[in-house]
């Protein structure tokens, strides 16, 4: 039997000025579900990073859309952020994901590439699917003891 859930879908233009709408919507949904304040703040950062990556990288000069789906389950919130823009070499980027050497001065940290590390750190699970565009599925559990620790929290799927 399939697990029951409610779904909220949104589409916004892939422009920076619309990211706050998604962040505020997610915060309202998470608050209604009973998430703790700190978890809501973590999810706000994660969804902002995912959307900002699309705004900056997916469509280059073209105008595109960001599709967002919230899956409201009894014990978790799943957030899917997707675009149909230009995909990139995810495996190459994944190999460069933090943690970063704290002995290096801040000036030597890369300007890009922290978003995926932040999302991975702040969410309980993250899956990234890439083929045409990019889809990021982020999960946050209401009760953290339900999180599995398999040592590889980022997984990737390629469409065939």
UniProtKB/Swiss-Prot annotation:
A molecular-function term among this protein's GO annotations: protein serine kinase activity
Pfam families: HATPase_c_2 (PF13581)
Broad class of enzyme this protein falls into: transferase
UniProt-listed Enzyme Commission number(s): 2.7.11.1
UniProt entry tagged with the keyword Nucleotide-binding: yes
Catalytic activity from the UniProt record: L-seryl-[protein] + ATP = O-phospho-L-seryl-[protein] + ADP + H(+); L-threonyl-[protein] + ATP = O-phospho-L-threonyl-[protein] + ADP + H(+)
Top-level lineage group: Bacteria
This protein's record includes keyword Signal: no
InterPro entries from the UniProt entry: Anti-sigma-factor_SerPK, HATPase_C_sf, RsbW
Family label: Belongs to the anti-sigma-factor family.
Name by which UniProt lists this protein: Serine-protein kinase RsbW
Gene encoding the protein: rsbW
